[in-house]
Regions:
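N-terminal Rossmann-like FAD-binding beta1-loop-alpha1 element of flavoenzymes
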Residues: 23-51
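Glycine-rich FAD pyrophosphate-binding loop
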Residues: 43-65
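Conserved beta-strand-loop-beta-strand element in the redox core of flavoprotein oxidoreductases
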Residues: 201-224
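Extreme N-terminal leader/targeting segments of oxidoreductases
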Residues: 1-23
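Mobile, glycine/GP-rich and aromatic-enriched active-site lid/loop segments adjacent to catalytic centers
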Residues: 119-209, 278-462, 547-662
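Core beta-strand elements of the Rossmann-like FAD/NAD(P) dinucleotide-binding domain
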Residues: 18-21, 220-230
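Glycine-rich loop(s) and the adjacent beta-strand/alpha-helix scaffold that form part
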Residues: 233-292, 466-479
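Long, amphipathic alpha-helical stalk/connector segments used for oligomerization, subunit docking
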Residues: 486-580
Length: 662
């Protein structure tokens, strides 16, 4: 096949827009909005320009786009940041960056208080101890959390909210900050929506320093080149890299947002940023097919889950699991709960069901009819606030969860760093808590000078959720302002010419223009592959060789090495992707990002010779947890010029004692 050259002979050349700023925010989710809010407080009065570039529309972008029914990280007066570290460490199987987690724990409550100040309805306890939903609490002028109001806890760390418009509220604060910066600095535009950043740009004279980013509009034929002094890369985690349980027309239904395409991990790796714990993944066990949340049902409504024989699989499978996983079975992290469920599913003891009907009937025994009606209403709102599709699945199948139990199912794997997972980038810590080797500069700065990350981007420190991600964004906003002030006399220069970047990025459209008429069916063509087809190949490869749902999350050294062969073939073919339109160009570049993020994941699993996260993945040739050799971080760097990975260990340090007040 002839090499691809783009001289825009067969497609329209895009308009090239160059935008200079000081602080560049890539992403528009919870982390980026928090960063915009805080950066405005510190940077605007210094005359520093802030620019946000969002792949979507900021009001409904990011993982919180559909809404949430709970804030999963609120420390409160009854807990301490040290308690929070113990909780996260326990759930992530003993290996976390405790400095980063502690840093979130001591700051996150202030962020939640801001959410309430901005209008987020938060459930409260009244003087008699009754639970009052957020809307009623607002109408009744109940005191705020900041003033000492008591939230309704669905778990030790979770508080209930009426959160359908959660992201809209947080986005409004971020956009107001951008508007203030725009007015004070006199720039015409500093908020770009529907612009997909696909590559970071390093400084020509110092490749270890960030200089900007480049992307394209998904609505207009425009290439955007952003030059900056410092950048936040907060473009979410990675979904649709593995074959999905949902198929056909339902393939878009996943637990994590399908537009998260691994951009954070891939773009950072390409400019030399160090990755950490990319072997980690999250496999949420949720309501089958709808992926609705189970947390409120388990924690607030006290529902129980059993196998088809009515057995509590978490109890019946404990003893056998201790042989491989010892103390980790008793500490019962999220992955271990998955593992105990999977044992029964593989043994034919499914379906696994959560008894929502029994839970509501038990609660109703001590309630009035009015209270029961309100409880059922809140149970439904739990889904309408954050996973409308779950309500749709129940309705389509003539199921009433208050009358019948519902199936649970572990999903396909996702890569993330903000929920019950810890994949991401290796970043500098706060400096006042932790060893010197964890603090080499500004808080949450990567190993690339001037490049920061937050939320799903910060590795080895999961369980931030929405509030913690926004908190990390706020931390970064202040740090980015400090970085700009400290480096005010420095300038950056691109190594790449914008014209050449346009040729590279729009190559798939040139390929389509040149070859689409070669065959009668544009989907079957020897000169190109369409992005949808390439994605299916990637998902099949990852599923079969890297431990997806098709193998019950099982892989091994030999399976991975076989997968690497096919991955190399896939990467070779990826350069022949075509794009009929801007949307397909978006899909093509999402694939480039997914391929690199997926490869990082596979190579980290190959390097770590143990099963650190049973229930998320299994190394069939190393089924046990091996604390003696592998209680450490697995980190890596990628050389984009050679395609080679350097994977290595970094020491784990325990900073918070095991003692727990509970």
């Amino acid at each position: 096949m002839e090499p691809k050259v783009n001289n825009f002979e067969f497609s329209e050349k895009p308009e090239i827009v160059v935008h200079e700023t000081d602080i560049l925010l890539i992403g528009g989710g919870m982390a980026a909005c928090g960063c915009a809010y805080e950066a405005d407080r510190w940077a605007t009065e210094q005359g520093l320009r802030i620019t946000m570039v969002d792949k979507a529309a900021t009001d409904r972008s990011g993982a919180v786009a559909m809404g949430l029914s709970a804030i999963n990280t609120y420390v409160g007066q009854e807990n301490t940041p040290e308690d929070y570290v113990r909780y996260v460490r326990n759930d992530l199987m003993g290996i976390i960056r405790e400095d980063l987690v502690y840093d979130v724990g001591r700051l996150v409550d202030d962020t939640v208080h801001l959410f309430e100040d901005w209008g987020l309805p938060i459930w409260k306890k009244d003087e008699e101890g009754h639970s009052i939903d957020g809307h009623t609490a607002l109408r009744n002028d109940m005191i705020s959390l900041r003033e000492g109001g008591k939230p309704v806890r669905s778990g030790r760390w979770q508080i209930m909210i009426n959160g359908e418009s959660y992201k809209v509220i947080v986005a409004e604060a971020g956009k107001a900050a951008l508007a203030n910066n725009r007015e004070k600095t006199g720039v015409e535009q500093n908020h770009f929506e529907r612009v997909f950043i696909v590559k970071l740009l390093s400084d020509k004279n110092d490749p270890t320093k960030i200089a900007g980013a480049v992307g394209f509009s998904v609505r207009e034929k425009k290439l955007y080149v952003f030059k900056c002094k410092t950048a936040l890369l907060a473009a979410g985690g990675c979904v649709n890299v593995f074959k999905t349980r949902a198929t056909g027309e339902g393939q878009g239904r996943a637990w994590f947002p399908v537009w998260n395409s691994g951009s954070t991990y891939a773009m950072a790796a390409e400019v030399g940023a160090e990755l950490t714990m990319m072997e980690n993944r999250f496999v949420p066990a949720r309501f089958k097919d709808g992926y609705g949340p189970v947390g409120a049902w388990f924690l607030l409504f006290k529902a129980k889950a059993t196998n088809a024989f009515g057995e509590d699989y978490q109890e019946t499978n404990k003893e056998e699991s201790r042989k491989l996983y010892g103390k980790y079975v008793d500490s019962m992290g999220t992955c271990m709960r998955n593992h105990l469920m999977i044992i029964d599913m593989k043994a034919g003891k499914g379906p696994i069901k959560i008894h929502t009907d029994v839970a509501l009937q038990k609660l109703a025994e001590t309630m009035t009819k009015k209270e029961i009606k309100h409880l059922e209403s809140e149970a439904w709102e739990d889904f309408l606030d954050m996973t409308i599709t779950q309500a749709g699945v129940w309705a389509a199948n003539n199921m009433e969860p208050e009358k019948v139990p519902s199936e649970l199912m572990p999903s396909e794997p996702y890569l993330l760093g903000s929920h019950a997972g810890c994949a991401g980038l290796w970043t500098s810590g706060p400096g006042d808590f932790g060893p010197e080797e964890w603090h080499w500069g500004y808080n949450r700065m990567t190993t690339v000078n001037g490049l920061f990350t937050a939320g799903d981007g910060v590795g080895a420190s999961g369980h931030k959720f929405s509030s913690g991600s926004n908190t990390e964004g706020r931390i970064v906003g202040k740090m980015m302002a400090a970085y700009c002030i400290d480096h005010k006399d420095e300038s950056v220069e691109f190594a790449e010419d914008p014209e050449d970047l346009a040729k590279e990025i729009f190559m798939p459209m040139e390929t389509w223009g040149k070859y689409s008429d070669y065959t009668t069916d544009p989907n079957i063509n020897p000169h190109y592959i369409r992005p949808g087809m390439l994605q299916q190949r990637l998902q099949k490869l990852m599923d079969e060789y890297v431990g997806g749902v098709g193998t019950w999350y099982m892989t091994s050294k030999y399976m991975l090495e076989e997968g690497f062969y096919y991955l190399d073939m896939l990467k070779e073919d990826s350069y022949h992707m075509c794009a009929e339109n801007l949307h397909e160009l978006l899909r093509a570049w999402e694939n480039f990002h997914r391929i690199l993020a997926g490869e990082a994941h596979a190579r980290h699993i190959h390097f770590r010779e143990e099963t650190r996260y049973p229930g998320y993945y299994y190394r069939g040739d190393h089924l046990a947890i091996d604390d003696e050799n592998w209680k450490c971080f697995v980190n890596s760097t990628y050389d984009k010029n050679t395609g080679e990975w350097n994977i290595f260990k970094r020491d784990y340090h325990q900073l918070v004692s095991d003692a727990d007040k509970s």
